[in-house]
């Protein structure tokens, strides 16, 4: 497929091999009109699950941002365990510095910035304990939450059974993806209730 330039309002080059930075308010029409390869890269920057991105691609063109968000919710609900792990792989631990592809997480974990060293150490220890118990990173909707709040939530979730915790992870991923997709479509995601986000752990947004 021939590469095309990123439409106005989209940061970065969606035609190259690298994932785009956090997208600005491009709008639904621009998203619907992107070539499939460019749209796929934009979606995978929101969530690294290939299955989730594929469902969203197949759903285009969306008549409204709300329809796209409903599609995202349904896609997350249909993810298999391997798909969920693939999605988790795209999130840094909460409290850790995000890498080059972690623009979303840096935004979402703003409440962790400037946290006192003792709380950061407790988060690091909590992340390790969580991963030892469940075998994957701690994913939580970090948007609007403080480091202390995320730590308290982590400690509470350590008491969950594995099956229960996977259900919580799926719910948190839905929130994160709604916030990110909403921003991609021009701010339609809303807050944690309508959209949500987390640092995956920080994993999360």
Predicted regions and their residues:
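Conserved catalytic/binding loops enriched for acidic/polar residues
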Residues: 138
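Aromatic-anchored, charged helix-turn/loop surface patch used as a conserved interaction hotspot
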Residues: 1-130, 175-190, 202-205
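Short glycine-enriched loops at secondary-structure junctions
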Residues: 143-145
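Long, amphipathic alpha-helical surface segments
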Residues: 147-191, 196-205
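Residues forming anionic-ligand binding surfaces in small-molecule and nucleic-acid pockets
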Residues: 133
